[in-house]
Amino acid sequence: VVGGKPAKLGAWPWMVALGFHNYRQPKKSPEWKCGGSLRISRHVLTAAHCAIHRSLYVVRIADLNLKRDDDGAHPIQMGIESKLIHPDYVYSEHHDDIAILKLEKDVSFSEYIRPICLPIEESLRNNNFIGYNPFVAGWGRLRYKGPLSDALMEVQVPVVRNKVCKRAYSDVSDTVICAGYPKGRKDSCQGDSGGPLMIPQESTYYEIGVVSYGHECALPKYPGVYTRVTSYLDSFILPALKK
């Protein structure tokens, strides 16, 4: 996350870090290189471009600082039983960048760990979210080509009309949602991929996007691009959660 601030303990109890093997140093602890969000009991929603790697093998749920044990968080680390990648996703392209991980076992919810809601209600399902200022959170880079963050960071970015977003990225379609400021400065970045774009409604958070791609990070006129969750509810997400 670029231009954000450290998240407070318990702010995002559905945040998941995705851990990858480093094959060159197999004894090393996981490399936390993507994000995701907890769904009911044992599934994680993330980006296909994260899930597709064979080196992905573990998740850590509801951590705050990935390197410290004294941050007050009570994270759970768990293996992955199976991965469901959107059938139309192609690694060299950006479309249909969505996947669901099924965990080895059910996650017990607590004050620290709970799932984020899907935008299933009509008022959300048919919303393009223009005028909203959603949050994005992750352990990704603090600037383009900069270091990954050990601390969970958060930032708010305004939703941009797809027409405007198309000026930056020609392949933008209705199945994505773009967010960022005209002057840049605040954005998700590499390592935040798969994490949630979130809006509060009353006191409940809903996930409206999944971090997908962007040109570098936080550049003027180049918003971040997110997979639009409402576009995939019936065709992919809800059926995948039954598996």
Curated annotation (Swiss-Prot):
Its main location: secreted. Residues 1-243 form the Peptidase S1 domain. Gene3D superfamilies: Trypsin-like serine proteases. GO terms for cellular component: extracellular region. This is Venom protease. Expressed by the venom duct. Keywords: Allergen, Disulfide bond, Hydrolase, Protease, Secreted, Serine protease. It comes from Bombus pensylvanicus. It is an enzyme of class 3 (hydrolase). Belongs to the peptidase S1 family. PROSITE patterns: TRYPSIN_DOM (PS50240), TRYPSIN_HIS (PS00134), TRYPSIN_SER (PS00135). Signal peptide: none annotated. It is found in: Secreted.
